[in-house]
């Protein structure tokens, strides 16, 4: 039997091609470069250095413009002519300012400083103040009280008012316990705080420090400070005074 060979035509179409809308796109990145193409720089704006570099002009020479050339110009300049021209210009400006001041008049009833752009002042300035005082003079001082009867009433009126009394106790003051029924009788301490009719007193005695509250009636203000060693030593003060009096007596 004769063998028959059947040849199948091969379809040679690209695999990685897309025929969407009749366009073919290559998805292979073999021939594509990673970096974008360089942009061409526009040559429209180019800066050109037109000035010259002169060290003496940059540094200023001896403090004048253009260095040595500036000094020569200053030496050749005529100062008298410039002074005359400047004086003439100043006179013209003064005349113009005087004319403007004469044209600008402030009424006496108006606020001068407010009209000129400032604040405050009296209406009409000093003239307005004088006219106001003339029209509204200050009231005369009250006459002294006539003396009636004895001089006691006059002395009473001449006395100065008394200064207000200080409160009984304030924080920082020194107080002593005057309640004989209290175990802290004649103890002396420093007032720390006062609330609701009571005061907290700090007794300092070396290692013995204690803060105790008392009623205001139980305490009395004291000028002399508390003893440094023992707060109970205040009890001995009257005894020491009595002993000193007995020793001083013959």
UniProtKB/Swiss-Prot annotation:
Cross-link type Glycyl lysine isopeptide (Lys-Gly) (interchain with G-Cter in ubiquitin), residue numbers: 52
InterPro entries (UniProt xref): NdhS (IPR021659)
Entries under Pfam families matching the protein: NdhS
EC assignment: 7.1.1.-
Localization per record: Plastid, Chloroplast thylakoid membrane
Gene Ontology cellular component terms for the protein in this record: chloroplast; chloroplast thylakoid; chloroplast thylakoid membrane; cytosol; NAD(P)H dehydrogenase complex (plastoquinone)
Domain of life: Eukaryota
Protein name (record): NAD(P)H-quinone oxidoreductase subunit S, chloroplastic
Species this chain originates from: Arabidopsis thaliana
């Amino acid at each position: 039997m004769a063998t028959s060979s059947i040849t199948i035509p091969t379809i040679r179409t690209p695999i990685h091609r897309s025929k969407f809308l009749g366009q073919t796109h290559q998805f292979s990145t073999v021939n594509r470069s990673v970096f974008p193409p360089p942009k061409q720089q526009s040559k429209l704006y180019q800066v050109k250095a037109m000035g010259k570099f002169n060290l003496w002009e940059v540094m200023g020479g001896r403090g004048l413009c253009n260095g040595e050339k500036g000094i020569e110009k200053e030496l050749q300049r005529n100062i008298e002519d410039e002074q005359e021209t400047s004086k003439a210009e100043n006179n013209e400006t003064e005349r113009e300012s005087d004319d403007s001041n004469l044209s600008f008049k402030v009424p006496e009833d108006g606020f001068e400083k407010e009209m000129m752009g400032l604040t405050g002042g009296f209406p009409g300035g000093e003239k307005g103040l004088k006219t106001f005082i003339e029209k509204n003079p200050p009231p005369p001082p009250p006459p002294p009280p006539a003396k009636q009867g004895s001089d006691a009433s006059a002395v009473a009126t001449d006395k100065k008012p008394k200064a207000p009394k200080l409160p009984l106790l304030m924080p920082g003051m020194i107080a002593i316990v005057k309640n004989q029924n209290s175990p802290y009788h004649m103890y002396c301490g420093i007032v720390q705080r006062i609330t609701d009719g009571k005061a907290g007193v700090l007794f300092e005695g070396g290692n013995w420090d204690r803060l105790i509250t008392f009623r205001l009636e139980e305490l009395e203000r004291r000028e002399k400070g508390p003893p440094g060693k023992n707060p109970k030593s205040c009890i001995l003060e009257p005894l020491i005074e009595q002993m000193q009096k007995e020793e001083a007596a013959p």
